[in-house]
């Protein structure tokens, strides 16, 4: 079996990490039991570009137990957990991923997992989907899935331009994904990454959050909960209004740059923090990114104008500006929660990856019946995931009476 990981001797530690995740992912483990019994993915070939974490390992093992053959590459050069990658190889998964990949390594690994002629592809960020469309028109795919807001935006653009060649389920758009993974998971793991990289006190700091989507609001809420004074930067009047009504200050980055001590980007867009903003910042300002790609902070511009730079501690680099101020960049401007920490807690990835597993099953069962467009996760899958999670937490919900069911179907009775 082909694979390329950093060190197979790390496999034993990786297995322990995966076991720890499995304990905290009851919904996906219940799906695994069903997959083991029914083998709904028998004969299916899957290639996936996902963050190679212990939680992803639980998903990939579940797909394999369901009958699929899986090849896996990492979706970020700094997010792979090398012990987990080694453990997955021993589980019979073709893994091409290691922490610290170059850009060439990253795309070479994507090429490797596509050699197995997948029938379904799974992506986190849209790079795999884009690569297939640009370089492998011969692939005959039943469909694909996409985990992130960034990837869904790219896929919707492909659909609108008429170039999308297969159906894709936007796992990101499931209620049981974005309400928990994007908001709660990213909120917690982003703060975790910042603290691991800096060990600073959050209380009393002025924090600037760029973007008030589900990710941004989760980060802003947790910063406030830890005692920070939070400023939100938004381009959408609707989200800006929501941030104001949630009690946050809202202003352009040009003004926030002079006030902030911690800056976190979560927009999915490019050059949100630019050179003109950085020059206005206070001495000692900290820059972190929680968007998918390392383009939200103008890292190139920062490096070009810096007089000098030095690594202070892992994932914390100091840049001295011509004006004498020092700016601190976390994790090279890449995903701070995965590069400087371990990503989302297993409990929240339980929801996202349950949606992934059931979406793959749905695509396989409906192959040839779906149009070449971006679909939301079917409501029945979303509700199934919520029920499985509640069951795993030992929580019961109130059932409706027959009278209530009938009342919800009628229109005659009012005041």
From Swiss-Prot:
Q: What Enzyme Commission number(s) appear in the record?
A: 3.13.2.1
| Broad class of where this protein is predominantly found | cytoplasm
Q: Which UniProt keywords apply?
A: Cytoplasm, Hydrolase, NAD, One-carbon metabolism
Binding positions for substrate per the UniProt entry? 53, 124, 147, 177, 181
The UniProt entry, under SMART domains, shows: AdoHcyase, AdoHcyase_NAD
GO molecular function, a single term: adenosylhomocysteinase activity
Q: What is catalyzed by this enzyme? A: S-adenosyl-L-homocysteine + H2O = L-homocysteine + adenosine
Identify the domain of life.
Answer: Archaea
Q: In which pathway does it act?
A: Amino-acid biosynthesis; L-homocysteine biosynthesis; L-homocysteine from S-adenosyl-L-homocysteine: step 1/1
Q: What class of enzyme is it?
A: hydrolase
Which cofactors are reported in the record for this sequence?
NAD(+)
Q: Which InterPro entries match?
A: Adenosylhomocyst_ase-like_sf, Adenosylhomocysteinase-like, Ado_hCys_hydrolase_NAD-bd, NAD(P)-bd_dom_sf, S-Ado-L-homoCys_hydrolase_CS
Family annotation (SUPFAM superfamilies):
Formate/glycerate dehydrogenase catalytic domain-like (SSF52283), NAD(P)-binding Rossmann-fold domains (SSF51735)
Residue sites binding NAD(+) per the record: 148-150, 182, 211-216, 234, 269, 290-292, 337
Question: Which BP terms does GO give this entry?
Answer: L-homocysteine biosynthetic process; one-carbon metabolic process; S-adenosylmethionine cycle
Q: Which family does it belong to?
A: Belongs to the adenosylhomocysteinase family.
Q: What does this protein do?
A: May play a key role in the regulation of the intracellular concentration of adenosylhomocysteine.
Under what name is this protein listed?
Adenosylhomocysteinase
| Species name | Sulfurisphaera tokodaii (strain DSM 16993 / JCM 10545 / NBRC 100140 / 7)
Q: What gene name is listed for this protein?
A: ahcY
